[in-house]
Amino acid sequence: MTAPSMDRSSQPHPGGAKGMRIVVTGATGNVGTSVVQALSEDPAVDSVLCLARRVPSWRPAKTTWQAADVEPGMADLVRLFDGTDAVIHLAWKFQPTHHPAETWRTNVLGSMRVFDAVAAAGVPTLVHASSVGAYSPGPKDRSVDESWPTHGWPQAAYTREKAYLERVLDTYEHAHPAVRVVRMRPGFLFKRESASEQRRIFAGRLLPGRLVRNTLIPAVPDLPGLRFQALHTDDAAAAYLAAVTRPVHGAFNLAADPVVDASVLAELFEARSFAIPAAPVRAALAAAWRLRLVPASPDLFDAVLRLPLMDSSRARKELAWDPVRTSVEALEEFLAGLRSGTGMATAPLAAGA
């Protein structure tokens, strides 16, 4: 859907020098809000056109907002992208997990519309939000670089869709060599303001935020394969900004130290960890998912236990990127937001207890 006109309530960047014009899809989500904020604060950026299905009251400097949906048959993306220096594509739908054809329509077909519109409008740079989830199952005892296969975990919709888009971009880059394509592959992204949204996406009503307290979590399960990487969303946004302003191309892994495992989680909750096979945990999750008590599917659980650990050396070197916060600090901030029901003034990030 498109609004009849763009909301230009934010003041343009002052000064006579012409800076970059950027379009951000999915501008109101966890990553989108951090990326838009980072762009709005950078002197190299003159204006940011923010696309979202629902226009928020949140208005950073230099931003113009447009209600737009990337799905087939919806917004005229070529018109919206015309005259732009770069498109950062972040729009993504996590639910409904019981109807993967619906998420496929938005995430895959919608992304393909974005890619095609970038080429048709003559936009020189496309920055796409890929993910660690695009990677094929990999090692947990060493890190892999961006050359690791990106076939995803085929049973989970999220990883299947992220991997499929990697293949789409492989073909796209051959067909459109004039477009500089950058693929960002972050680990799990957390910030205080995303806590309510992420609880709704992954845990639903089964996990009220007020229950995530140390006194109520005496132990953390130590599952085989439970080793993952995380980073603060604002640190990921800094990498997106660098990808726009630096003449780089290709894929970039993004992760902060340390690797998160059961011992790290146990320390966060001041609890003990205990070894348990994955099968009973998966069975309980599958039952809760079938009963629609939790939105996250057991297939996504399987995928998480198979994700490789990533080497972020390329991002640190070519993007001059160095995360400000550790993965533990990002998780601490997220958990604090979860307990307090923190959010932001956008529809996806709306606060909720």
Predicted regions and their residues:
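C-terminal amphipathic/interface module of NAD(P)-dependent oxidoreductases
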Residues: 2-11, 15-16, 71, 272-275, ...
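N-terminal Rossmann NAD(P)H-binding glycine-rich loop of SDR-like oxidoreductase domains
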Residues: 20-41
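NAD(P)H-binding glycine-rich loop region in Rossmannoid oxidoreductase-like domains
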Residues: 57, 63, 68-109, 117
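Glycine-rich NAD(P)-binding loop of the Rossmann-fold in SDR/ketoreductase-type enzymes
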Residues: 102-113, 160-161, 231
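Catalytic helix-loop patch of NAD(P)-dependent Rossmann-fold dehydrogenases
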Residues: 141-185
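NAD(P)-dependent short-chain dehydrogenase/reductase
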Residues: 172-228
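Mid/C-terminal beta-alpha module of Rossmann-like enzyme folds, strongest
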Residues: 227, 235-296, 332-333, 341-353
